[in-house]
Amino acid sequence: MNDLRKETDSLGEVNVPADKLWGAQTQRSLEHFSIGRDLMPREMIQSYAILKKAAANANYAGGRLDGKIHKLIVHTCDEILAGQHHDMFPLHVWMTGSGTQFNMNVNEVISNRCCQLAGTALGSKLPVHPNDHVNMSQSSNDSFPSAMYIAAAMNVTQRLVPAVEALHDAIAAKSNQWDDIVKIGRTHMQDATPLTLGQEWSGYAAMLADGLARIDDALKGVFRLALGGTAVGTGINAAPGFAEAVAAEIARLTGLPFVSAPNKFAVQGAHDALVQLSGTLRTLAGSLYKIANDIRLLSCGPRAGFAELRIPENEPGSSIMPGKVNPTQAEALTMIAVQVMANDVAVGFGGAGGYLEMNVYKPLIIHNIAQSVTILTDGCTNFRTFLVEGTEPNRKKIKEYVERSLMLVTALAPVIGYDKASRIAHYAMDNDLTLKSAALKLGFVTEPEFDRIVDPAKMVKPYVAEIKVPLAIGAKTG
């Protein structure tokens, strides 16, 4: 059995494992809220270390924090930022809605590590007290949401955005490479007029670019921090100027444009900026779902489907059917998209859970956003690396579909009229003819007219056929 030590808080003594850096309040949370397997996101450990370091710097600069205590706190925060002590943050997501227990977990770990560095006993709170020093000028009610915003912003800008940009660039490169491949378009899952494969993929690239722009716009609100609002947004126990100073310090430490929120009541009673950010993740997920499904559909086959695209073989596709290749990267990405959409529903409900001066669904919100960002990042990277970059067109099959398509008749409509063009398409279908054969049999155009007007390469951009020679008998309506 592990040795224990006594730690104290306002409720009395608590037994804590002797080798752990956390204190009484963390231990109480472990005993009362060990629910499920979801731990607080690792990103929150890092963001809180940044926040506590910035607060110590601001309090020291403001003359409120002793120099030796300041150095101990900063040193410990730097250790955490370097990846040390992460096993000292064991709390589960499903705790108090304010995140107070996690804030105290951070305060206690920093305090006890400072005690170790100073050569004093764990739990002595000397020379660094978890509340008086580490939590100086703060409340859980403003520090936890600020840590949420820092974690979300860093995770999005440092991980998700580069991953989406790389996927966008890979798709855009394919679009440019395939701009000369004319293929048949499809609407309602039925044949439509032609476009190029490059144009089709340019749409995918544009969707991702738009998604990145939406995320960038949403981040503007996430950069506004609650820190300095303390308990209810008034700033009680925070010195004048602390809010602005600590936000500037966080901006310096992260390289991101964090500022003090102009109205602390709004960002402590609600977290609309994170709800908006989650909405942009949901929109991105919807785009990825469409892109993955399109590629999955166009690659279906190889002999009884569209088979317009050849996708890489990641692994054997079946335990019973030899030689089968499945679009597993597309399937994985669509599952990720569904999970992100579900997470957004939770974030939306959580964001609405602001009662009076404080939102009480904070851990739920950051848990779901952190998961969404992580799986979107990894999903985009895998989809690019193991599918997009290795995908190739089946030019023979694409050409065959274009030549067989009845919807090329659309180019004839401005010349012979919609009704006659429709008759050609139906006649070709009913008699198993090519479009050209049907048009000539009905006598609506001559062969030279058909060849000039019905040119798939012309139809991939704005194009209206002109009448340059007398039309065949019966071509004009009336």
Curated annotation (Swiss-Prot):
Substrate binds at residues 98-100, 129-132, 139-141, 187, 319, 324-326. Pathway: Carbohydrate metabolism; tricarboxylic acid cycle; (S)-malate from fumarate: step 1/1. GO terms for cellular component: cytoplasm. Disulfide bonds: none annotated. SUPFAM superfamilies: L-aspartase-like. Belongs to the class-II fumarase/aspartase family. Fumarase subfamily. This is Fumarate hydratase class II 1. The gene is fumC1.
